């Protein structure tokens, strides 16, 4: 095992940079809370240091269709020097280091794993504190969830049916960056309808004797 994963995972042959690392943790929050699944398009932009390596500055935008709970929306990921603007000085982005900003019609929510700050547009008269029934389930913790699943057969919160789609979603950003173009995404068939040339980045042909079925 070679340590320093934040170095070697920036080479495409060995990893997928922060999109394959912290994005799985941070994008999980809006992906879970807003019931996101497969995007309709993805536009990944970055300033690569070298064709073989993950860019040092990244911005990726996915478009998600509406569902019965919410309208369509854009989800944008930033890493490196490029950062989103903050709607107010109340939000100290640099003090957080990393987090998620939800921007809605009536206000904003800035959150990470331990902190949540709400700022409303206008006064507070239209604000109703969420009821307990409106909250997403809390995790028991990785180890307790695993034991609970073994004993009851119940799925873990981040089971493969969920996490597989989340990782697929994030990796589409890496494919878009490497393609240098916005991709129109057909999730059912796992292909970019406007860029057949990226198929080798989506499906890998394994050497004879090394086959992965799935």
Predicted feature residues:
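Contiguous beta-strand/loop segments that form the cofactor/metal-binding neighborhood of enzyme cores
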Residues: 1-161, 165-214
